[in-house]
């Protein structure tokens, strides 16, 4: 289910016209892409479910790298990403979404006027019936 979630999440984010300012949205950090780019930095899953439905709890960290020398320069884009992730439709190929929860974020300045932001979410998924 973890790989199904990763694929669905990337496709969902890439399909949003409000995120058209992002040069590439990839499953992993792109090897050579001009910022801004968005990728899955990491994911991990554990067993989760209910009495009658098996599932997984999956944590996904998304990384946005952008060019800006302002601390809040990428804030509007991060807000759009957050809203889009939380709006992921519940019925997907390979799983049914039970819940999404924002866990934490980190932001840092990097060399050459680059900024990086990490957004971490918890997804609880049911296996398909």
What do these predicted regions represent?
Residues 1-52, 83, 88-92:
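Small/polar-rich, solvent-exposed N-terminal microdomains that initiate assembly or binding
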